[in-house]
Regions:
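Membrane-proximal basic amphipathic "stem/tether" segments
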Residues: 6-14, 19-75, 414-420
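Catalytic binding pocket for nucleotide-activated donors in carbohydrate/polymer assembly enzymes
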Residues: 318-386
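A donor-sugar binding/catalytic signature common to diverse glycosyltransferases
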Residues: 132-139, 143-156, 300-344
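Short acidic-hydrophobic, aromatic-tinged amphipathic segments that line or gate anion-handling sites
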Residues: 113-118, 294-298, 354-365
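Conserved catalytic-core segment of nucleotide-activated headgroup transferases in glycan assembly
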Residues: 77-88, 205, 215-289, 359
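Nucleotide-activated donor-binding/catalytic signature segment of Leloir-type glycosyltransferases, i.e.
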Residues: 284-300
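Active-site and donor-binding regions of nucleotide-sugar-utilizing enzymes
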Residues: 69-226
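C-terminal amphipathic helix plus adjacent low-complexity
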Residues: 39, 361-420
Length: 420
């Protein structure tokens, strides 16, 4: 027989009021983030806690004052910037170099747990290195509590900053939550910026104040000039049909399926007098319909292909500055410019920077290349605005790394956590 309980009216109203406020708060959280998001948040917290527990053991190991660690998740092999810095460092100093590069997809939902062996190796080297150099967001660099003696340099993998990233690109509560929990771009000692103009945007994107920034240029600018002839001959040996031809290089940034209009520009140049090189982003899965005059040249990098390009078409990537450093005619194919201004957003207006060489229509762009002479002052002014150092850039960058990192005599080698 079911027992009956008598509750006073006042208690009923109080209970209802408490329940109302409780469920109102829960519903607000669910509407803002969602239950799955809340679970993910606590899984991230648990993952980071476990990583730091493991890392505390590695931090008992001594620091090698001549050890420099390079970390990247942009590619499975070292970038030209990393390789040139390593070469110059080894020439200037007696250093121990460790390079760890592995491409990690941006699905943060399970990234903490699927890459544990990699993270453990990174933790060992972070705990025993004096200097760490990264070219993008790296989980172990940002979420771990490091020794005070570890100096971390961020040399962002893109020469420019046309499109927003990092903190300036966060649009939703979910993105903000993920960025906060994964401590996005935390723990950097110094961030390298190619100009005062770019530094202004980097401060917003990385979330750092003035004293964390150093002026310096990526070594790729030097590489483009010193290896121009060598790269051209390599490509000509592989593609002898490129000799004495007018070549158009198209190197767009990544697009998801459904937003990609690359096929339109391929069609515009098919059966023309130009050879067309299509160099899409590594993450692109779209298949294109191409003819015999279109090449993908997948065995060569965009930097190498710039050596044979007579015309360069790109959009919001750093390729525009890389091509401009060689005074190549640069055209912006910004068919989704209005959408990009909304998400992720633009730091500076490429439509204003390039004027009549900015296009949203592929056939109009083709007509411009085919019939109009290019005003190279446009790319000269553009490059000089966003990149200030052009001579001995690798040596100057390595000098900064040595001065601010390896020769930091005031470092305390005891086990202190690095302050933000």
């Amino acid at each position: 027989m079911m027992k009956s309980f008598r509750i006073s009216k006042g208690k009923i109203n109080g209970a209802r009021l408490t329940a109302f406020f409780f469920f109102d708060i829960v519903n607000r959280v669910r509407l803002t983030l969602g239950v799955e998001c809340m679970i993910q948040k606590y899984l991230i917290k648990v993952g980071i806690f476990l990583l730091n527990c493991s890392y505390s053991v590695f931090k008992l190991l001594p620091t090698n004052s001549n050890k420099v660690l390079f970390l990247s998740r942009q590619s499975n092999k070292p970038s030209i910037d990393f390789r040139m810095i390593v070469s110059q460092l080894e020439e200037d100093r007696d250093v121990k170099i460790v390079i760890m590069t592995k491409r990690i997809e941006k699905n943060m939902k399970d990234v903490l747990f699927k890459n544990v062996p990699l993270f453990l190796r990174q933790m060992y080297h972070l705990a025993t290195s004096k200097v760490c150099i990264v070219d993008g967001y790296n989980i172990t660099v940002s979420v771990l509590n490091h020794k005070k003696c570890l100096i971390i340099f961020q040399i962002w993998h893109s020469l420019g900053a046309a499109k927003k990233f990092g903190y300036s690109a966060l649009k939703t509560p979910y993105q903000q939550m993920i960025a906060k929990e994964l401590k996005m771009h935390k723990n950097y000692s110094y961030i390298i910026a190619p100009s005062m103009e770019i530094k202004k945007y980097f401060k917003q994107c990385f979330g750092y104040k003035e004293d964390h920034f150093l002026l310096g240029t990526l070594p790729r600018i030097e590489y483009l000039k010193t290896h121009h002839r060598v790269n051209k001959e390599k490509i000509y040996r592989k593609y002898p049909q490129f000799r004495n031809k007018k070549i158009v290089l198209y190197a767009p940034t990544f697009r998801t399926q459904g937003t990609d209009r690359t096929q339109e520009i391929i069609d515009a140049f098919q059966n023309s007098k130009y050879l067309f090189i299509l160099k899409v982003h590594p993450n692109t899965k779209t298949k294109y319909h191409i003819s015999n005059c279109v090449y993908d040249c997948r065995e060569f990098s965009t930097l190498q292909l710039l050596s044979v390009a007579d015309y360069v078409i790109t959009d919001y990537s750093g390729t525009s500055l890389e091509a401009a450093s060689l005074k190549k005619p640069v055209y912006i194919y910004g068919y989704d410019f209005e959408d990009y201004q909304k998400d992720p957003g633009m730091n500076y207006d490429l439509k204003k920077e390039f004027g009549k060489y900015f296009f949203e229509d592929a056939h109009a762009l083709y007509e411009c290349i085919a019939h109009e002479k290019y005003d190279k002052q446009v790319v000269i002014d553009y490059f000089n605005k966003y990149v200030v150092q052009t001579q001995d850039v690798t040596q100057k960058l390595v000098d900064l790394i040595i001065e601010k990192g390896l020769e930091d005599e005031e470092t305390d080698y005891r086990l202190f956590e690095k302050t933000s």
